[in-house]
Design a protein with these regions (language model features):
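Electrostatic cytochrome c docking/interface patches
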Residues: 1-16, 26-34, 84-112
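N-terminal export/targeting leaders of redox proteins
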Residues: 1-10, 51, 176, 187-191
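Stable alpha-helical elements in mature extracytoplasmic
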Residues: 8, 15, 42, 49, ...
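Extracytoplasmic/secreted proteins, especially bacterial periplasmic and envelope-associated proteins
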Residues: 11, 18, 45, 62-65, ...
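Sequence context surrounding c-type heme c attachment/ligation sites in exported
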Residues: 11-17, 43, 108-119, 138-147
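The canonical Cys-X-X-Cys-His
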Residues: 17-25, 78, 115-124, 182
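Periodic glycine anchor positions in long extracellular repeat architectures
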Residues: 24-27, 40, 123, 139
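Axial heme c-ligation environment in periplasmic c-type cytochrome domains
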Residues: 30-37, 52-94, 130-136, 154-179, ...
Length: 191
């Protein structure tokens, strides 16, 4: 399930009109903090997530319903459109102590709990790795990141199958507190 990089952002813009109801006209101002910021997200990652929503592999009924009848080209166009938009940053608001601890986890992991460094896949600025299909995580809302890391930890999100369950393995070693400080920290990362 990988994009052919043949998406047309202009065609995707037309497809995205219905998406604006939840993700905002700019793709970066979701109406609820649990919804992702899509603007500037890596195209390959977006396409793969859309395809998983459509097939039901990633179980979010609202998204599956929105994608009924969409062709592969439609999904590629949507991914190209959102990838073409300027990314929106955020601000970390945690205490200095929490931000230092989150930075340690992000850059170095937690060896004794077998938690890999987030930066290994998402990069030092949280922009991900477009070629590998790893997502941009900087600028996401704290609520969205907490929800996704918790779903990975509890085994409810399995969209990492093509990577051997990597995110589930990483998140499994994180406490609620560590997830919360990481979510705040990555929101404020700058490329």
């Amino acid at each position: 399930m990988f994009a052919n990089a043949a998406g047309d952002p202009e065609a995707g813009k037309l497809q995205a009109m219905v998406c604006a109801g939840c993700h905002g006209l700019d793709g970066a101002t979701p109406v609820l903090p649990e919804y992702p910021n899509l603007a500037g997200q890596n195209e390959k990652y977006l396409y793969n997530q859309l395809a998983m929503f459509q097939s039901g592999t990633r179980d979010v009924p609202l998204m599956t319903a929105q994608l009924i009848g969409k062709s592969e080209q439609d999904l590629e166009d949507l991914a190209a459109f959102y990838a073409s938009l300027p990314a929106k940053g955020g601000e970390a608001t945690g205490t200095d102590e929490d931000l230092r601890r989150a930075q340690q986890i992000y850059k170095g992991g937690i060896m004794d709990k077998k938690v890999a460094a987030c930066a290994a896949c998402h990069g030092p600025g949280g922009v991900g790795n477009a070629q590998a299909g790893f997502p941009r995580i900087n600028g996401q809302s704290v609520g969205y990141t907490i929800e996704q890391l918790t779903k990975y930890r509890e085994g409810h999100r399995k969209s990492d199958e093509s990577f051997g369950g990597m995110m589930r393995g990483v998140a499994h070693g994180l406490t609620d507190g560590e997830i919360a400080i990481l979510a705040d920290y990555v929101r404020g990362l700058r490329p």
